[in-house]
């Protein structure tokens, strides 16, 4: 999979500034996976194979993980919600799009993590709205900590930067 992602320039080498402010010689641009349905399908299936039983909803972090969550939602019949980066200030003023009931169990999908701060922030927003984050999976982890946690939940990953 790593070589396939490299061949499509989803994994790039060079000098890059990351969202965390760190610099890296490797950049993982999973937002471009939507242009390669075959690779997208493979990664979605890898994520789906890790989903624990009794999940009520799937949510992808904005915006990189939304295509993953959408595909998995449709193919695995798991209702999806969409977490906005910022709450709307018009219309319904929603932070979360899609139907949900407080107390439902959510799997949160992320594309790439470095510190884990973005996915933890997303998990907190879901919980503030009455949802229970039961599982967190990221496609790639850049974290130096191989055992990132949120509350008592291990942040699982398909691939680690060390695999590249």
Give residue ranges: language-model regions.
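A contiguous pocket-lining binding segment that forms or flanks enzyme active sites
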Residues: 101-132
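PRPP-dependent phosphoribosyltransferase catalytic core
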Residues: 1-5, 123-164
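Short, glycine/charge-rich flexible loops or terminal/linker lids adjacent to PRPP-binding catalytic cores
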Residues: 68-107, 117
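Active-site-facing substrate-recognition patch
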Residues: 1-53
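Short, well-ordered alpha-helices that flank and scaffold nucleotide-derived cofactor binding pockets
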Residues: 49, 70, 74, 124, ...
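Short glycine-rich phosphate-binding loop at a beta-alpha junction
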Residues: 54-62, 138
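Short helix-loop-beta connector
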Residues: 52-56, 101-103
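Structural detector of well-ordered beta-strand residues that form the stable sheet scaffold
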Residues: 58-59, 81, 134, 156
